[in-house]
Amino acid sequence: ALPMLYVPRHFFINNHVAVEEALGAETYAEILYHAGYKSAWYWCEKEAECHGLEGVDVFEHYMTRLSQRGWGHFIVEAIDLDAGTCRVRLEHSAFAYQLGKTGHKEEYMFTGWFAGAMDQILAARGSDLRTISEQTQSAAEDGCEVGVFKVKPLTGAAR
């Protein structure tokens, strides 16, 4: 198991919002995507080794642990390692609970996590396929009750 830090939700969210206000949401999202990608890769690599997991089991384990840590409830709706695709539903988002209906996709911090996890699993299988992730909806948006994240293969210039 990896060392953990535990902080109150309001403490983390308040710090997150302060950095977003200072940098701008777009810049902050880009920074968090890359940092989250790297962290997810590392976490999945270490946990797979520790627990003898591989493939989809690594991704499912990651979603379970994220859910247990209080970020929200992450549900893998679909995953296809051969295609490099995945769809994750987020219920009970810590961001949506703390911030309410803002009209924005507030959970962008999580986006790089899904591609990082998927790519580590693919690399462990010997695949050169790499992915990108995007948030398509948030419980913080009007008319939405859950967040949705989609992972798809990198193509063309994006590689």
Q: Model segments located where?
A:
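N-terminal accessory segment detector
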Residues: 1-109, 126-131, 137-159
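Active-site helix/loop of acyl-thioester processing domains in fatty-acid/polyketide metabolism
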Residues: 108-125
